[in-house]
Amino acid sequence: MTGVPWWRGHRGEWWVVGQGVLIAALALAPAVWTWAGPSRGLWRALGGVLIAAGVTLASTGIVQIGRDNLTALPHPPARATLIQTGIYARVRHPMYGGLIVAALGWALWKTSGLHLILAAALTAYLYAKAGYEESFLAARFPEYQAYRTRTKQLLPWIL
């Protein structure tokens, strides 16, 4: 602990607050600009599959990163090590990627245009947060640049 209040945000605390606000908005927003009709069941099924895939990706990231590395903050903990195995051999930020996939799934489940907009906003936000986090990781771990060139940032094989 440095004695600096959390609200000064020197470790990226405000990034976590913003992420929480977007996730809460996505979870609690009413379904607006909905598309219904005979295909609604298909959209909900696809949404359910994406939610399950996103939760699986994020959960795998949480388990494999280990307790010493786990933090919601962009700044890595003092005891952190660079994990490059398991899911981290394919994607650098599987927890963010999982949130993105689950958010899209939730929007499809809700069949709501507002939820699609919020999922897109969360995607852009997590992409920016990952970039901010990577500046700390590159400064901390000399091998991070090589790791960055051989792995995707958020979604395996895609982004």
Residue spans of the language-model regions?
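Conserved SAM-binding loop
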Residues: V91-R92
